[in-house]
């Protein structure tokens, strides 16, 4: 399993680098050797934009093959032209790459602990939205919006009637990778999420080295802090598929925005626009947070007295033009095809997703005290040692906030005000979610989105703290003790955060995986239910666990028309699930008890407590 997962990551990393290297080198050459850090993230953004534009016409697996021809050719040309300078920062690129793959493997610990590739985390949108959508897209293009799909499955209905909220991107990358590499979808879901989250290391590394002009060791410390952030493991376990793909793009887009405004580079600004242009179609809320943070960055440039405001015109125009062009199709779907109204009307999303019904306290937000201790669906008791060390964990949380504030102050005094401003703008948006909207889930998600930047500013304060102290006349003689103090604080935080992340990973293992081996064994149903048949799952008293099982049944029966009657529990999980259709209009009925009419039992699954019945009459009365 480990070798297979690592091989998948290497393939994805190589492909995305080929896809994004040429554009990155062409537009952001002024960033020197550090631009190579962004190549795979730029490649991911290009791929997502390709899905947004093309999957209404072709099956998703065609998109990467179409894109790799022009963008791969461009990468080849740019490598040939700039091969001497491409690896000028080879140490940063190498260590960031190793950190990315290490983080990827650490995130997949919950999958490896299951002993087989499956949906390893909490059962939610992974089984009800993303996997069914990807399964439909294995051999179909996106269905037309708001039209009854020709093949009526859980995935096709979702894509047709709510897919405009994620135009072109829901399930596309899973379907494409599955078709090309021949991996089953249930084995790909968590690795793709882990890979996207791990790519954030490269994005934030660029921000630290170029945006903050910090040292190599500051970038290493930032990566370690991010790799031990419990909210990243929480994101993976919850199966937040769109966010996992969008997070590295979000970070890279902001890093490029700050760099472009500072350097006055229209090319880097255009690249920032292209990268950010993938966000509205990928995950609209993160596009909103991006806009808020980028606006803060621009205001910091414009408002500062010494700024040459004329230098901002070209990069701003380039960024806006590139962003609008890249996101045009997504914006059309969000506005004209009512995708935005779906986001605005999703009032029930405030209690269901993420299991967040209350605001996390500051010690949990800092990451040093395990959030798994209070996360409502699977709250776990603190261990004996954790209970004894709780005062130290609280102290570490206080140090996190202190270092974060010092890091922001240092950035401001070192002339890195736009970089500090984007973080402050994000914090203001989180405050708005908490105090004005009173939305615990939205607030917690903003904390997740800002985790990479929080890691950067904490590391920026802790590493080489003595250099900053030396610039303060009253305490300049204490620079060496300040360095030692900063490193000691960093070690304490890393140990506490690593413990919290370990507890978060263990929390997911308390619950069975979303798809157990028995659930995956339901694929045997395909042997008795031919393709093209119509199937009704009849289980009106379905509990939440049984709804997940119904999702597994649907996954086991691709290319069959699929309808569910499951009562009112978690209403909206399946289309009109509380309306019983006429059973005799279906070729097969699956359920715990016999349906009405001339159905005969053809198969039983005692382990899953499901029976398969086939219509035996010639007409439906």
Describe the predicted segments one by one.
Residues 208, 298-305, 317, 321-325, ...:
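Hydrophobic, aromatic-rich transmembrane alpha-helices
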Residues 39-51, 98-106, 179, 192-262, ...:
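Membrane-embedded helix bundles of polyisoprenyl
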Residues 20-22, 72-82, 191-212, 402-407:
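Transmembrane-helix motifs of polytopic, lipid-linked glycan transferases
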Residues 229-230, 282-286, 330, 461-462, ...:
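Transmembrane alpha-helical segments
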Residues 103-249, 447:
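Active-site lumenal/periplasmic loops and adjacent helix-entry segments of GT-C-fold
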Residues 317-324, 461-502:
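Signature aromatic-anchored transmembrane alpha helix within multi-pass, membrane-resident enzymes
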Residues 1-96:
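Membrane-embedded, hydrophobic transmembrane alpha-helices
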Residues 128, 194-197, 243-249, 288-289, ...:
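Hydrophobic/aromatic-rich transmembrane helices and adjacent perimembrane loops
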